[in-house]
A protein has these predicted regions:
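N-terminal flexible/basic segments that precede or flank functional cores
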Residues: 1-51, 109-147
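Conserved hydrophobic/aromatic packing and binding residues within compact polymer-binding modules
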Residues: 57, 71-72, 82-85
Length: 147
């Protein structure tokens, strides 16, 4: 499996959909359907019933194509608060977590009420070890691989 660290996440592995070529002694990696892959990663993160990790928060913000400043304005906090969430210096409040998930789903036109995400997080404990996200390319799209 290819460890896809280029996403900014340490727990993403790709079963296929990756081509590695060596040209003039340099190794080049290409990934099929990058937009679809990032969408599959984001969907997996959004639908996971554990609080967002700092790197997942940043990944979703980048997928939304919004700056820290713009997201801070939406959430009514200062830009440094968003930066601290993304650096893991400050715990991400449950309501902020749910709101970011809802914003992402809205951007994909897959609207879920914020209460869905609050309920998803309500009775969970943050896991010590990061959950590994395994994806495979199936025909023309990426899917989560169940163990």
């Amino acid at each position: 499996m290819y460890h896809y660290t280029e996403s900014g996440l340490s727990n993403v592995y790709l079963k296929n959909g990756v081509t590695v070529e060596v040209v003039d002694g340099e190794e080049y990696t290409s990934i099929d359907d990058m937009n679809g892959l990032h969408s599959a990663i984001a969907q997996t993160i959004v639908n996971t019933n554990k609080p967002l990790a700092h790197d997942e928060f940043k990944f979703l913000r980048i997928e939304l194509n919004v700056s820290q400043k713009m997201l801070a304005n939406r959430f009514g906090v200062d830009e440094q608060t968003i930066a601290r969430y993304e650096k893991g210096q400050t715990k991400i409040p449950r309501t902020t977590d749910a709101a970011l998930r809802a914003l992402y789903m809205e951007s994909q036109e897959k609207n879920n009420p914020v209460s869905y995400f609050l309920d998803l997080l309500a009775n969970t404990q943050a896991e010590e070890a990061a959950k590994i996200i395994r994806l495979e390319e199936v025909e023309d799209h990426w899917e989560k691989v169940e163990r």
